[in-house]
UniProtKB/Swiss-Prot annotation:
It catalyses: alpha-D-xylose = alpha-D-xylulofuranose. Belongs to the xylose isomerase family. It comes from Solibacter usitatus (strain Ellin6076). This is Xylose isomerase. One of its GO terms (molecular function) is xylose isomerase activity. InterPro entries: Xyl_isomerase-like_sf (IPR036237), Xyl_isomerase-like_TIM-brl (IPR013022), Xylose_isom_bac (IPR013452), Xylose_isomerase (IPR001998). Its EC number is 5.3.1.5.
């Protein structure tokens, strides 16, 4: 057997905060108990297949620089299995419990719809064997409905019903495989479900198609007995000018309009929040408040660039506040932290993939430790509770319970001659408080 591409890298171990080994975890101790649960079980971290094993390091101005062995030659079954073997070598050396994939990431290239179905089933057998041998689990699967030229005008929102049918075929078989592999979620990302120009777009028609597609996905989920969660991943633009799943609020409105808000949750990506003009924690807190928080694509964007840079997370403060709101919402159930991130074009050596993931894992672990301390301290929650205390009183409850009319409120306010006075929001004090946990 040919030596693994990653043979020079030993399994990554926890060595503690004092370690100077760049290929060791300093904060991620998977068995450390945080808020009554093992760190590994809190964070449920996953490696993504696409950026890690499919990216060739190309950009708009130059060709690939990575030259991985599995990038050479036609993407036939032998190459797909070569890539799969290396992927599981990476997963096991990194020691994370989950991975995620698109159908076309893992399978041999297909030239017909029949080949697509057959090739996916064939590689599915090999994936099942590798999972059984290593204990690595599948966080979620998804179908790539954006890369092939057939999807240049969208998949579910495409003007051509045959493209819609092809997309439906991919989703059906990818969900079937996800179920077979014990996947805990199935993701829908509408990379080209949007438009580049309104001049050739029928918005009402396309949104009706999207709604029907999603309903069929839910119907199939129940038909096959898939117990996982269906997730939608919001993104405002790129590759289209405007995407229909713009942000959390937009997706929630779409779900409500189609009566699916109890069936679907959201997979929130940090970089997509940046592109939508939101903070990462805003999108998380909004999803938690609306009851649709599901999972995380953990990465970072660059606020000075207007595109999806998909960098590995390294901002402990941002991750701390993000995880604080996740913990407040009860934490993950079927979801987790998928590292939807890629090494930079100049980082082409095998070790670079490990440096990137080790740093990201430790950043998230630090964030969890800090967020847990904030929860245990209780000061921030206490400040917020006190700020809204009036709504827990008799008047506040009567308003929210629908026992007061606009007229009654107005008459009472005038009769009492109320003179509300502003109260400080204490923003700077609260920011200082959070800083003490970092």
């Amino acid at each position: 057997m040919t030596e693994s591409y990653f043979a020079s890298i030993a399994p990554i171990e926890f060595e503690g905060a004092a370690s100077e080994n760049p290929l060791a975890y300093r904060y991620y101790d998977k068995n450390r108990v945080v808020l009554g649960k093992r760190m590994e079980d809190h964070l449920r971290m996953a490696v993504c297949y696409w950026h890690t094993f499919c990216s060739e390091g190309a950009d708009m101005f130059g060709p690939g620089t990575f030259h991985r062995p599995w990038h050479i030659g036609p993407m036939d079954q032998a190459h797909a299995e070569h890539k799969l073997n290396e992927a599981f070598e990476f997963f096991t050396r990194l020691g994370l419990p989950f991975f995620c994939f698109h159908d076309t990431d893992v399978m041999a290239e297909a030239h017909t719809i029949r080949e697509h179905v057959d090739n996916l089933a064939r590689i599915g057998d090999r994936i099942q064997e590798k999972m059984a041998a290593t204990g690595v689990k599948l966080l979620w699967g998804t179908a790539n409905l954006f890369s092939h030229p057939r999807y240049m005008a969208g998949a579910a929102s495409n003007p051509d019903p045959d493209v819609f049918r092809f997309a439906a075929t991919q989703v059906r078989h990818c969900m079937d495989l996800t179920k077979r592999l014990g996947g805990q979620n199935y993701v829908l990302w509408g990379g080209r479900e949007g438009y580049d120009s309104l001049l050739n777009t029928d918005l009402k028609q396309e949104k009706a198609q999207l709604g029907r597609f999603l309903k069929m996905v839910i119907e199939h989920k129940h038909k096959i007995g898939f117990s996982g969660t269906i997730l939608i991943e919001p993104k405002p633009h790129e590759p289209t000018k405007h995407q229909y799943d713009f942000d959390v609020e937009t997706v929630y409105s779409f779900l409500v309009a189609n009566g699916l808000e109890k069936e679907v949750k959201l997979n929130i990506e940090a970089n997509h929040a940046t592109l939508a003009g939101h903070s990462f924690e805003h999108e998380i807190a909004t999803a938690v408040a609306l009851g649709v928080f599901g999972s995380i694509d953990m990465n970072r964007g660059d606020p000075q660039n207007g595109w999806d840079t998909d960098q590995f997370p390294n901002d402990v403060r941002e991750i701390t506040t993000a995880l604080y709101y996740i913990l407040l919402g009860g934490g993950f159930t079927t979801g987790g932290n998928n590292f939807d991130a890629k090494v930079r074009r100049q980082s082409f050596e095998p070790a670079d993939l490990f440096y990137a993931h080790v740093g990201a894992v430790d950043t998230v672990a630090q964030g969890l430790i800090n967020a847990a301390a904030m929860i245990e301290g209780g000061q921030l929650a206490g400040i917020v509770k006190e700020r809204y205390a009036g709504w827990q009183g008799e008047l506040g409850r009567a308003i929210l319970d629908g026992k007061m009319s606009l007229e009654a409120l107005s008459d009472g306010a005038v009769a009492e001659g109320i003179t509300p006075r502003p109260r400080s929001g204490r923003q700077e004090m609260i920011e200082n408080l959070v800083g003490r946990y970092l």
